[in-house]
C-alpha cells in the first residue's frame, strides 16, 4: 500500500531515510501499511520508546496525544463537521502543551490563529480504500464543506470526512 516508514526522525512527515542508529532516549516511529489481494489497503502507525519505557517528557507528550485521540473519538457522531473534531483535538493539544510550558495563551485563539499548526502540521485523518489515501482530494472538494471555502491554513487544509482517526503532533 505504501513504503514503510521506520524512523527516529518522526518530526519529518513521511521520512523514508533509514541511515540512523537508534540510541537510548530515542522514539521510534513506524508507519506501515498492507494491501489485500482484493486491493484494499490498511494503514497503521505507532511510536515506541527505544528503551521500552517513556522518559517523563515522552510520557507527558504521549498522554497529550492519547487525550487528543480519546476526545476526538468521543466527539465523533453523525452530522458533526469533521473540522469541529479537528479543532477539538487541536485545543486538547494546546492545553496539554501549555501545561508543559511549550505554548501559552487561550487555546481557542491559538487554534483559530493557527499557532497549534507548528506542532500539528497535518490533518486528523484520511480516507482509505483501494489506496491508502483514497480519493485524496474528495473530502476537501466535495465532502463536508457545504460551499464553505477550503482553508489554506497549515494543518486545516487537509481535513476530510475520513477514517482512520490519527490525531498527533510533531515536536522537534
Question: What is each model feature region?
Answer:
Residues 1-172:
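Active-site neighborhoods and metal-handling regions in enzymes and metal-associated proteins
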Amino acid at each position: 500500500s505504501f513504503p514503510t516508514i521506520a524512523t527516529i526522525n518522526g518530526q519529518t512527515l513521511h521520512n523514508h531515510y533509514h541511515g540512523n542508529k537508534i540510541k537510548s532516549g530515542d522514539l521510534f516511529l513506524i508507519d506501515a501499511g498492507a494491501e489485500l489481494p482484493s486491493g484494499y489497503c490498511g494503514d497503521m502507525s505507532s511510536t515506541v520508546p527505544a528503551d521500552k519505557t517513556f522518559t517523563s517528557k515522552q510520557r507527558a507528550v504521549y498522554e497529550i496525544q492519547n487525550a487528543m485521540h480519546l476526545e476526538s473519538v468521543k466527539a465523533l457522531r453523525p452530522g458533526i463537521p469533521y473540522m469541529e473534531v479537528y479543532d477539538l483535538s487541536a485545543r486538547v493539544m494546546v492545553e496539554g502543551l501549555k501545561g508543559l510550558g511549550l505554548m501559552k495563551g487561550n487555546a481557542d485563539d491559538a487554534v483559530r490563529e493557527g499557532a497549534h499548526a507548528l506542532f500539528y502540521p497535518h490533518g486528523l485523518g484520511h480516507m482509505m480504500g483501494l489506496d491508502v489515501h483514497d480519493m485524496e482530494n474528495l473530502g476537501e472538494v466535495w465532502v463536508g464543506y457545504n460551499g464553505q471555502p477550503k482553508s489554506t491554513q497549515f494543518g486545516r487544509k487537509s481535513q476530510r470526512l475520513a477514517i482512520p482517526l490519527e490525531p498527533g503532533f510533531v515536536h522537534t
